[in-house]
Regions:
Chain B
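Alpha-helical transmembrane segments, especially those used as permease/efflux helices
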Residues: 2, 6, 11-35, 52, ...
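Hydrophobic alpha-helical transmembrane segments of multi-pass inner-membrane transport and secretion
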Residues: 14-40, 51-85, 109-118, 122, ...
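Small-residue-rich transmembrane alpha-helices
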Residues: 28-39, 76, 110-138, 152-174, ...
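Short amphipathic alpha-helical coupling elements at transmembrane boundaries
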Residues: 7-11, 82-92, 246-253, 261-269, ...
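Short cytosolic juxtamembrane segments of multi-pass membrane proteins
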Residues: 3, 176-187, 433-445
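A cross-kingdom feature of multi-pass membrane systems that activates on extracytoplasmic/periplasmic
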Residues: 32, 36-49, 256, 295-316
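Conserved transmembrane alpha-helices of multi-pass membrane proteins
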Residues: 47-63, 137-166, 185-198, 310-322, ...
Length: 293, 445
């Protein structure tokens, strides 16, 4: 028990230079997976290899059905890939029971979802400290208040989620994701349900978590404006990596995305050559992307 | 709209299971007892036999109908609430509230009819067994023949259908009101009714002391008192739950870790909704424990006085036990049904809890603590109501303390209540945990 706790605490500080690493991760959905004659399955992820350094802010984009949510769920241990390797902070995520995966996530991974996913019966402060409580870790009241003050909710500690606006709820979710000092924060369409002003605040907070506090943030989004807050954008199409942009601008992201959409709709199962040795335009060799650092 | 009702029942029969059970139980009980009317009306039945049979048949008549009504209403309310999305879809495609009402009433009639038809066979057997008990005790002549005829069938069908239609109207009215965004009325009537039940119950229990120890109707006053007290506690159960939480929440949360912590906060916020679970639990415990222990005390008193049981005594015992059995069965059905509904309704919440870092075991611990606390609260107030009646009866009837069997009986009743509560909520939660957390959160709820 104590050993685990210590390891969790260490993971929060020291850390591997590579926050997240995916090696040939594949995931298929539906019946007949395995490639038989009556194969009705859909390939959601096709041997995706990706490496994100610690302290980076990455947006994952792609048309609907490109596999971006599946990628996030596999990387975050919410779904199990059919094959491939996921490493968070240098440690391999082994596909054990749900309880084992949960314990793996607790000290390493934080989440922010489109629908906030706060517990309705708990106050802002209680929601924020819930991950610590579930992990049996000590709760530092001053630190909780500090984190909530950082997201601008220092005066809302005793409120319940239904007394807050959407933007405020998402900021509680961000505080909850950061309070465990995770190595990677995964955000799934964090601004999808917000108005523009609240969205901007949320994106600035995520940016701050990276720039000021050195966290690693991976964000799935379909909004080029949201993606422009990231350091880099990784594009997905038909379950494969389809290029990246460093220091993205809104226009560049939108243009690239429109192009991806055309290709995906064009009927080609895979818009980029699958044969090795033929790198797709804008893609690093063999669907592998290594970002800066 | 009726064809839609028919289709919806045919496509998803499983979700009407609880309503079917309630209708089956209701129709079965009604027909069983009313077959005694048929028997009494038979040719060549002597007057005493006819009177015994008619009295016994009438005992269940009044409150039996009420029980059937409430049981079906409880299951249908749950059914309609869980289909909020489907009903909203029907409204947005142009169904008027009246059409939706007709659909729900139609479904209810279809299910109730199925329940009644299924109940005929068991009711014939049950009626014969009941009749046999009266004949064995000598209350009914040996030459009387059992009959299961028009009175049993028509009353069973009429009562169940009436209850089903009425309950459907009630359920759909509650649901459409909730959909229209209106808050449930605060319920001043309810508070008044609860207070009245407590006062009348206390009065009824007190009235026991003014009665003679050998009076045949001695048991009636404390028994009704206990039932009324239980009803009163049931009405005020949200307040009582909050009171107990105020006392025990802190030590419990400290003792039980994160699961207990979440359970305490959930119950505090949801005290009002949990009344639907506490109510049948309090009633079940109070009614079952009070009647069973009073009967035990009575048996002991008779044995001590050296008298053999008269036919009337035996009759009373049979009826007592039958009545308790029926009330307990209905209360148990309502308890399991509302608890199942309340728990499966929380799939999304459990998903959120898991995404926040809760292992499946911690979710089960949360639900288990809630179930345990509800069981303790419900059985405590049920016991309080039952004990008031039993102690009053015992002190008037005999001078001795409670016989030992009473404690065993009481434990048995508590065990049944606890098992129904805990097994239902843990079993339902286990099922919801099979959905991956991300999918559970996406479920509309």
């Amino acid at each position: 028990m104590f050993g685990k706790r210590n390891r969790g605490a260490r993971a929060g500080r020291a850390g591997h230079p590579e926050a997240l690493r995916l090696v040939k991760v594949s995931k298929r959905y539906g019946s007949g997976a395995g490639g038989g004659p009556q194969d009705n399955s859909v390939t959601a992820l096709d041997e995706v290899t990706l490496s994100l350094p610690a302290g980076s802010f990455t947006a994952i984009m792609g048309p609907s059905g490109s596999g971006k949510s599946t990628l996030l769920q596999c990387a975050a241990g919410l779904d199990r890939p059919d094959s491939g390797l996921v490493m968070v902070d240098g440690e391999e995520m082994t596909g054990g029971s749900e309880a084992e995966l949960t314990k793996f996530r607790r000290s390493r991974i934080g989440f922010v979802f489109q629908q906030y996913n706060l517990l309705p019966t708990l106050t802002v402060a209680q929601n924020t400290t819930l991950p610590l409580r579930l992990a049996g870790r000590r709760i530092d009241r001053a630190r909780t208040e500090q984190v909530l003050a950082q997201v601008g909710l220092g005066d809302r500690l005793g409120h319940r989620p239904d007394q807050l606006s959407g933007g405020q709820r998402q900021r509680v979710a961000i505080a909850r994701a950061l309070v465990t000092e995770p190595r990677v924060v995964f955000a799934d369409e964090p601004t999808g349900a917000l108005d523009m002003r609240s969205a901007r605040e949320v994106l600035r907070l995520l940016q701050q978590a990276v720039r000021v506090h050195g966290r690693t943030v991976v964000m799935v989004t379909h909004d080029p404006v949201a993606a422009s807050y990231a350091d880099s954008v990784v594009f997905l199409a038909d379950g494969r990596l389809a290029g990246q942009l460093q220091s993205p601008s809104v226009d560049a992201v939108a243009e690239r995305l429109a192009h991806l959409g055309d290709l995906a709709q064009g009927g080609a199962r895979s818009p980029y050559p699958a044969a090795p040795g033929h790198p797709a335009p804008g893609t690093a060799t063999d669907h592998t992307i290594r970002l800066g650092a | 709209m009726f064809s839609l009702a028919w289709k919806s029942v045919r496509q998803r029969p499983a979700r009407f299971l609880a309503t079917l059970l309630a209708a089956l139980l209701g129709a079965g009980v009604t027909m069983t007892f009313n077959s005694l009317h048929d028997t009494a009306a038979g040719a060549g039945v002597d007057d005493t036999s006819a009177e015994t049979l008619t009295t016994a048949a009438s005992v269940v008549g009044g409150y039996g109908t009420l029980l059937v009504f409430f049981a079906i209403a409880s299951t249908l309310t749950v059914n309609v609430r869980q289909r909020g999305e489907e009903i909203a879809l029907l409204r947005s495609t142009g169904a008027t509230p009246a059409q939706i009402k007709r659909m729900v009433v139609g479904e209810s009639v279809v299910v109730a009819t199925a329940g009644m038809l299924l109940a005929v066979g068991p009711a014939m057997l049950g009626g014969r067994a009941l009749f046999g008990m009266f004949q064995d005790s000598g209350q009914v002549g040996q030459d009387v023949d059992f009959a299961f005829g028009p009175i049993a069938l028509s009353s069973g069908f009429a009562i169940t259908l009436l209850a089903a239609v009425g309950a459907a109207f009630l359920a759909v009215r509650r649901a459409t009101r909730a959909l229209a965004g209106g808050r449930a009325p605060r319920g001043r009537l309810r508070v008044l009714g609860g207070a009245a039940a407590l006062v009348l119950g206390a009065g009824s229990v007190a009235a026991t002391f003014s009665m003679d120890a050998t009076e045949p109707a001695l048991m009636a006053a404390p028994a009704y008192g206990a039932i009324l007290l239980a009803v009163g506690f049931a009405v005020f159960s949200p307040h009582l739950l909050r009171l107990l939480l105020g006392w025990f929440a802190r030590p419990l949360a400290r003792l039980g870790g994160a699961g207990a912590y979440l359970a305490v906060h959930n119950m505090r916020q949801r005290a009002a909704q949990l009344a639907g679970v506490l109510m049948p639990l309090i009633l079940f415990t109070g009614v079952a424990a009070a009647t069973l222990s009073m009967q035990t005390v009575e048996n002991d008193a008779l044995a001590a006085s050296g008298l053999t049981k008269s036919v009337d005594d035996k009759n009373l015992e049979t009826l007592n036990l039958t009545v308790v059995g029926i009330i307990a069965a209905f209360a148990c059905l309502m308890l399991i049904n509302s608890l199942y509904a309340a728990t499966s309704y929380r799939t999304q919440e459990f998903g959120r809890q898991r995404l926040a870092g809760s292992t499946p075991r911690q979710v089960l611990a949360t639900v288990g603590f809630e179930g345990l606390f509800l069981t303790l609260t419900g059985t405590f107030f049920g016991t309080l109501a039952g004990l008031a009646g039993t102690l009053a009866f015992t002190s008037v009837r005999t001078d001795t303390a409670l016989p030992d069997q009473v404690y065993a009986l009481w434990l048995g009743v508590l065990a049944v209540g606890a098992a129904a509560t805990l097994l239902t909520c843990l079993g339902t939660t286990r099922r919801t945990l099979r959905t991956p957390a991300v999918a559970a959160v996406a479920v509309a709820g």
